[in-house]
Amino acid sequence: MAKVCSVCGKGKVSGNQVSHSNKHNKRTWSANLRSVRAIIDGAPKRVKVCTRCLRSGKIERA
């Protein structure tokens, strides 16, 4: 299972980490994922969901 939200598809994003001296280093930011048991197709299943989808009630927890 990838590090991607199973509801909205949110995953890693890349960008630059900028220091005080303005040096740029490539880095990635990961989505804030939680492994939860959710009702999917009428049966409980363990899926990775981002906290934004959890808070907005886009899934029904088991």
Swiss-Prot record:
Q: Which cysteines are joined by disulfide bonds?
A: none
Q: Which Pfam families match?
A: Ribosomal_L28 (PF00830)
- UniProt cross-references to InterPro entries, sorted A to Z: Bacterial_rp_bL28 (IPR050096), Ribosomal_bL28 (IPR026569), Ribosomal_bL28/bL31-like_sf (IPR034704), Ribosomal_bL28_bact-type (IPR001383), Ribosomal_bL28_sf (IPR037147)
> Is the keyword Ribonucleoprotein in the record?
yes
Q: Which GO terms describe its biological process?
A: translation
The residue ranges crossing the membrane are: none
Domain of life from the UniProt record: Bacteria
One GO cellular component term: ribonucleoprotein complex
Q: Which GO terms describe its molecular function?
A: structural constituent of ribosome
Record key words, sorted: Ribonucleoprotein, Ribosomal protein
Q: Keyword check for Ribonucleoprotein, yes or no.
A: yes
Membership in a protein family: Belongs to the bacterial ribosomal protein bL28 family.
Protein name, per record:
Large ribosomal subunit protein bL28
The species is Clostridioides difficile (strain 630) (Peptoclostridium difficile)
